[in-house]
Amino acid sequence: SDYIRYGCRVDITADNSPDESVYPTMADFTFYGGVYRDVNLIEVPDCRFTMNDYGSDGIYITPRRVGEDGWELSIKALIDNADCSHKARFTLIDADGNEKASTIADLRPIISAKLPVEDPVLWNGRKNPYLYTVRCEIFDSTTEEVTDNIDIRTGLREYHIDSHKGFFLNGEHIKLQGVSRHQDR
């Protein structure tokens, strides 16, 4: 960047003007203005997973059952500057560090990919909080050099709510208890 150099001071100005594209715009508690948490300067490659999708890392992973025993992860990845000569690789890694599945996709602004999951271990809250890791990488298709990567931990589970019987996780009725609490500072 022409504006930021290592070793120089960076001044930040905060604007607390209402913005309808950012939730929440109204609330039952006081909004504080300004910067009241740490600020980090992040250096990223030109071709990367987006960092500007409303606070997300630009990668959305949805587990779903396929047939009786099969599962798959549906992946949607948002890419900045996708016109580079790179590719994306998505790898499913189990809790022991073993690679279970992998796929490679051409780079474009929105990538859709699927990863099959054989013999899955289902996430089951406190009983079995088993998590897989989905390693998401952008790499140079010529040199194989990884230029951006994000590891996302995710669980495989299905749930539904019955208006008479309550909440079900992986086919088992679960009694939910909780509190209403928010953090504003």
Feature map (PLM): residue ranges:
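Secreted/periplasmic carbohydrate-active enzymes, especially glycoside hydrolases
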Residues: 1-185
